[in-house]
Amino acid sequence: MKLGVVGLGQAGGKIVDALLEYDQRTNCHIVHDALTVNTATADLNALEHIPADARVLIGKSQVGGQGVGGDNELGATITTEDITEIQHVIDTISVHEIDAFLLVAALGGGTGSGALPVVGRHLKQLYTEPVYGLGILPSTNEGGLYSLNAARSLQTAVRELDNLLIFDNDAHRQANESLTGGYAAINRELATRLGVLFGAGDIDTGTANPESVVDASEIINTLKGGGVSTLGYASQSLEEEDGAEAAGLLSRFKRESSTDSAGGTNRITSLVRRATLGRLTLPVEPANVSIDRGLVIVAGPSDCLNRKGIERGRTWVEEQTGCLSIRGGDYPLPESNTVAVVVLFSGISGADRLHELRSIGSEAQTTGAERTGSSDRHLESILGDDADELDSLF
């Protein structure tokens, strides 16, 4: 699946930078084009993989390259006023060659949080390709302003985007990890998950069974319908499993002779369970939330893609979620020494983390100033019954 990727703000730019590094290192070629947008010159200069001519500085006359200081209303205003500058770079993308846009932003900051729904709305007005978002939730200890920014940005972005994938920093930072090191590790982990998910939709069917391989339409159909999504991931190194001394030809022979074995089936079903019940990007208990659609992707060497295991894993996910719209398939990676599983849940309602975010944001908004707002039933199902207490960004 080919993506036009847009990083918005500091965190969005860094994640797109990490995704480009992953794309180049693994040759998965999911990033057809990438650009980043920011109001801070220093953040743009710190990037390593995004080309210099694809780094767009906006708000020069308003903030002079110094950023918006966490003010996402100002971020949204500047993005709206300077949307033509962003479009000049988007015009260099061969949009007819991509399957979707992916916008990436931290929801708690200023530039990315404000720009996400603005750019999403703009792209949907101009193009027929789906426009997806990846929104990073702030940590709960970052304070009420960040939660308010995130709640308002999320509420607006859900309305403007075709789907919003959520990543919760709190669920993925390791204890005693430095802030810089923690976010760098998170960005690499995110890039891997996105690489497996969207890479699965860009496979040469000449090297894979067309009955089981996942294509771009499967991913698009899973994300169709809007709302928010979460992504689970688990992997198993084949060298670790077989022992270092059994790697190479002997390891491959053993795998080929047991493609349909109970061991191959159990490996996949175990990974599906770990991906589903482990660290989802938006932490939820699948049995305790409403899920509209889902997708199970198993990636690895073709001789390890056990059909029985994939089907059993997909069926187990159906049973756990109560959702009957769970797709399943494989992603052949001939040179890989790892079997990995990605589980995508889309159209989620009732997530405790989002209700908590809305509650903190509402409290911060009430404390800061008296506001009025509105919301529709769809937003209430995502953010909770009190979603109308929050103002959208526009």
Curated annotation (Swiss-Prot):
Keyword Mitochondrion: no
Main location: cytoplasm
GO biological processes: cell division; microtubule-based process; regulation of cell shape
Top-level taxon: Archaea
Binding of GTP, residues: Q10, A11, G12, G13, K14, G110, T111, G112, E142, N169, N187
Task of the protein: Involved in cell shape control.
PANTHER family: CELL DIVISION PROTEIN FTSZ-RELATED, TUBULIN-LIKE PROTEIN CETZ
Family, similarity comment: Belongs to the CetZ family.
Record protein name field: Tubulin-like protein CetZ4
